[in-house]
């Protein structure tokens, strides 16, 4: 007969649940767990190879942090016995062996600690894979990803050299990669049509200037004529009888080296009958020398800061004018060309006129283009045999070596001049290419470069001359990787495009933020003196209205 056994009921008046542990479960260890944990945590060998860190600990849990199931090695005191503690001399092999054993013990201890806190241990092969993945990821981001996006954010949109109006029509567009492929070899030897002006001789004492014997840059008040093509009386006279394309060396150098430019610039083109005239706008910034234009991080200060792009350009132009005259033997004997300076009036003092000579040269480009260019020399130099060499004098200026990956000229110019010129070529590639093209067009034997730095980084009004350097234009062109064939190819391409246009006025404009130049057709009266007078009158009327 079945017998009913009354169960033992535990009464817990002060709480909920049993108040004592049953006998069969008294010595059994227990560790809290979660029924929501994923299965497979024990045998997860793939966790070390996860590329996304979000899935590295997908089997981890907030439970299981206890040490109920952890194994701890306890020493058995029953086996304790006294031993001889006398120290014996150990061999080098034994010392190294103990050192490796201690390192292995520390590694095992760290591994046990990581297991205790559910940290994932990567095997040796997985560690190497992870390091290789991180290295490749950083390399990729440095070359293509993060760095490029950061540069795009840091670059501010640049302003155009002239405001493009709504009634201007785009006639042609040329991108720089296309222009860089141009080549033209059918260029005849230049012929001198007329030479004007007078040049002062170069003072060779400036070749001995070093950073230890620096020389202050003086402010020399002389008149520099920057007359555009159509205002030149000699070109007007020559245009009646010969030539069908006319320009100045500065304008042609801008076009021939345009693929290196970053800032915006513009050139006015006038098609009169079968003739082309390349001009610059009046009161434009065309003659200002840019500073660090092609650097990775060009100057971006705004407002009245002396390190803003425009103020730096004005400072560089000021330095270039003063150095080109200070390094000459001013007030002494001059080298006179057959004709006088066409821009100097009879009542003007010759000592107030800058040392400059104009050489009007003629090139034959193929069978249909007769190019006449006004080129310039800045000085003359006597050689060892008493011969005369014409030179172009230009100036590189240091404004702050901490910017644009610059090099401190006072420390490197004498010992590592190659590093200085390499940095300048990187930061001012377009400016150096323009100067080289001007020297090649003029036929100058040498290109003199002066190194001028600020007296103090924060003072843009005082400067010192730290040294000079001399180059032959052809050799310097190869050093700066300037292809003369490509330069003539770009010029021939621009001339052919303009020759296909109808008679009128056009504008060649470099896009301020893209590697593109465009040709715009301009309405009648654009950039004329009458239009400028009307704009000035409108500005004066607006100022009077504001005052009232």
Swiss-Prot record:
> In the UniProt record, which is one GO cellular component term?
eukaryotic 43S preinitiation complex
The PTM Phosphoserine maps to 161, 528-529
Keywords from UniProt, A to Z, are:
Acetylation, Cytoplasm, Initiation factor, Phosphoprotein, Protein biosynthesis, RNA-binding
Q: Where are the transmembrane segments?
A: none
Identify residues that carry N6-acetyllysine: 53
Q: Where does it mainly reside?
A: cytoplasm
Q: Record keywords: Protein transport included?
A: no
What's any GO biological process attached to this entry? translational initiation
User: Which is an annotated GO molecular function term of this record?
Assistant: translation initiation factor activity
Protein's cellular compartments: Cytoplasm
**Family annotation (InterPro entries):** eIF3d
Can the keyword ATP-binding be found in this entry's annotation?
no
Q: Where is this region: Disordered?
A: 523-548
Span list, region RNA gate: 285-299
What residue spans carry the Acidic residues bias annotation? Answer: 529-548
Notes on the domains: The RNA gate region regulates mRNA cap recognition to prevent promiscuous mRNA-binding before assembly of eif3d into the full eukaryotic translation initiation factor 3 (eIF-3) complex.
Whom does it interact with, and what assembly results?
Component of the eukaryotic translation initiation factor 3 (eIF-3) complex, which is composed of 13 subunits: EIF3A, EIF3B, EIF3C, EIF3D, EIF3E, EIF3F, EIF3G, EIF3H, EIF3I, EIF3J, EIF3K, EIF3L and EIF3M. The eIF-3 complex appears to include 3 stable modules: module A is composed of EIF3A, EIF3B, EIF3G and EIF3I; module B is composed of EIF3F, EIF3H, and EIF3M; and module C is composed of EIF3C, EIF3D, EIF3E, EIF3K and EIF3L. EIF3C of module C binds EIF3B of module A and EIF3H of module B, thereby linking the three modules. EIF3J is a labile subunit that binds to the eIF-3 complex via EIF3B.
* Record family assignment: Belongs to the eIF-3 subunit D family.
Q: Which PANTHER family does the UniProt entry name for this protein?
A: EUKARYOTIC TRANSLATION INITIATION FACTOR 3 SUBUNIT 7, EUKARYOTIC TRANSLATION INITIATION FACTOR 3 SUBUNIT D
The task this protein performs is described as: mRNA cap-binding component of the eukaryotic translation initiation factor 3 (eIF-3) complex, a complex required for several steps in the initiation of protein synthesis of a specialized repertoire of mRNAs. The eIF-3 complex associates with the 40S ribosome and facilitates the recruitment of eIF-1, eIF-1A, eIF-2:GTP:methionyl-tRNAi and eIF-5 to form the 43S pre-initiation complex (43S PIC). The eIF-3 complex stimulates mRNA recruitment to the 43S PIC and scanning of the mRNA for AUG recognition.
Task: Output this protein's name.
Answer: Eukaryotic translation initiation factor 3 subunit D
Q: Which gene encodes it?
A: EIF3D
